């Protein structure tokens, strides 16, 4: 989980060993068109959560499921890319899992940390209550608000570490007319500021109060971006997007209400407004666009079709 597009699109595979509760993670690296090798990313060892309610507790089988976030101290892993080591924590999102293997390993004797499970459930309820309040405000304006919010946070982030304070977030919500009650905001802040240092990653803040698309949808966003990012730099020139975006099968083109060029120009204009650089789009900005679009589309397959059709994935 990173604002750096190259890091966000890294292809990783991990293994958890129940006999000693250790884990290891490898990265797929492609060299040329046909050669792929697997390199160590996180060395095999026993690790603990670095953030959240489970901070300090060792990873266990129950921590692994689609959508789970694994956290590691970047300083513990000397071989990590410099772009990742710039951040205190390395955060990895589980996007796929071998469910058959997982189910076969689960046993009725697995001890449950009931107090933490209850706390995490309550945390989710706090966020859901806020998300429900904001859902109506985001309806039909999701793309504009999410892309605008992402750009606004980048401008506030003078140090470039992704961390902002409480006043920054309150101001951002006010600017984009996403105000929530003081009680709800403080409840969310207590959960998000788990280190108690008065600063929170703005990506975590957005995911908490607005929510995020599921991993199935997100996998197609990554596929589209990776197809555009020919050189794997983490940013895509607007010229690449113009070249690859196909509006031929867009509903408004088929109905005759718009031309292909009008749809393409409208899409590019929306992206440009969201970008910090006028001639390229970062992965975070690309994801913000589709995060906003996702809010307005209920059915997963409808969303995937909207992605697959113009990008040919």
Swiss-Prot record:
Residues binding Ca(2+): 193, 195, 197, 199, 204
SMART domains given in the database record: EFh
CDD domains reported in the protein's UniProt record: EFh
InterPro entries xrefs: Ca-bind_SignalingProt, EF-hand-dom_pair, EF_Hand_1_Ca_BS, EF_hand_dom
Pfam families referenced in this protein's UniProt entry, alphabetically: EF-hand_7, PH_CAYP2
Sample GO molecular function, one term: calcium ion binding
Keyword annotations from UniProtKB, A to Z: Calcium, Metal-binding, Repeat
Gene that this sequence comes from: CAPS2
Domain EF-hand: 144-179, 180-215, 216-251
Protein name: Calcyphosin-2
Lineage: superkingdom: Eukaryota
């Amino acid at each position: 989980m990173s604002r750096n597009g190259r890091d966000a699109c890294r292809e990783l595979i991990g293994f958890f060993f129940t006999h000693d509760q250790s884990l290891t993670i490898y990265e797929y690296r492609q060299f040329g068109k046909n050669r792929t090798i697997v390199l160590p990313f996180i060395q095999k060892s026993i690790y603990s959560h670095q953030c959240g309610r489970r901070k300090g507790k060792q990873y266990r089988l129950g921590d692994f499921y689609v959508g789970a976030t694994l956290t590691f101290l970047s300083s513990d892993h000397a071989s990590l890319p410099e772009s990742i080591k710039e951040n205190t924590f390395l955060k990895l999102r589980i996007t796929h899992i071998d469910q058959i293997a997982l189910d076969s390993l689960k046993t009725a004797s697995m001890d449950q940390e009931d107090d933490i499970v209850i706390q995490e459930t309550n945390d989710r309820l706090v966020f859901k209550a806020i998300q429900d309040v904001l859902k109506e405000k985001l309806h039909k304006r999701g793309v504009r608000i999410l892309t605008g919010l992402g750009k606004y946070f980048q401008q506030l982030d003078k140090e470039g570490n992704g961390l902002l304070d409480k006043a920054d977030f309150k101001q951002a919500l006010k600017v984009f007319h996403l105000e929530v009650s003081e009680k709800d905001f403080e409840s969310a802040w207590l959960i998000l500021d788990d280190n108690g240092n008065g600063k929170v990653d703005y990506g975590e803040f957005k995911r908490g109060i607005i929510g995020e698309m599921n991993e199935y949808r997100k996998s197609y966003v990554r596929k589209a971006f990776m197809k555009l990012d020919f050189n794997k730099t983490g940013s895509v020139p607007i010229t690449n997007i113009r070249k690859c975006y196909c509006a031929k099968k867009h509903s408004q083109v088929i109905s005759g209400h718009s031309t292909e060029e009008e749809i393409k120009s409208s899409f590019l204009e929306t992206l440009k407004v969201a970008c910090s650089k006028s001639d390229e789009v970062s992965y975070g900005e690309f994801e913000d666009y589709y995060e906003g679009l996702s809010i307005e589309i209920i059915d997963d397959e409808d969303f995937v079709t909207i992605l697959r059709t113009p990008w040919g994935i």
